[in-house]
Amino acid sequence: MDKYSRKWFDSIVEQVIERLPQLVREAMEQVPLYVEDYPPRKLLRQMGIRDRRQLWGLFTGVPVNAKHFDSLTVNLPDRVTIYREGLMWSAMRPDGYVDEKLLKKQIRVTILHEYGHYYGMTEEELEQYGYG
């Protein structure tokens, strides 16, 4: 398998998921994890991000602690998306090769960060736990 192919990256993501805390894996049953190569341009413009490699993940939806069961509003389904290109770039060594150990760490931190948002954690709280 080509080391930098999408198939290779997906296998790394699967390895990381297997080692995630049970609470997060249970959340994944309710809030699916998607892997995309890079974020859409429209999203980057909305977020004020110029380099698409700077966005590694995104939670979209309503955090658990903000859901109201008596609300009549319709929301898009909750989801977490991680972006392959940015994560690969974040683990790139000076010689141009991807550090697989660092890549696994970055994927783990990104997934935990985004599911932290699902549980209602702020950026500051995530930073305190090392998932900033």
How would you name each of these model-derived features?
Residues 1-106, 118, 124-127:
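Active-site rim/adjacent substrate-binding subdomains
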Residues 110, 114-118:
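Catalytic glutamate of the conserved HExxH
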Residues 128-132:
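Short hydrophobic/aromatic patches at helix-to-coil boundaries
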